[in-house]
């Protein structure tokens, strides 16, 4: 769907009816047990699978992904896990969260920009200890 503004649905008469598609941001986070490459990659992969699955997103829907890590996590780029999942044509970026005193450590966050059916509301996914970050979201786990 990348680059398309509307998706067509064929009726039985053969005409094409268009439905609106919009660009939506999907948010999520996961906690990481240790500053180790394997732990960061595993937590990122679980987070991405959950976000994509719960929102019915496919690789072709994705526009970009922005990953952030808390300052205590620097053993690996989360984008490596996304590439291993097959997101080879999706622009990915990694950055460090600001070090706010007293904030939760050991956290990977992601914001996925994707095209989605207009009727669908985004399901934001917060796994592990990060569920405490956004208790206000119905989609938070």
Please report, for each region that a protein language model flagged, where it lies by residue.
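Terminal domain-initiation and capping elements
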Residues: 1-141
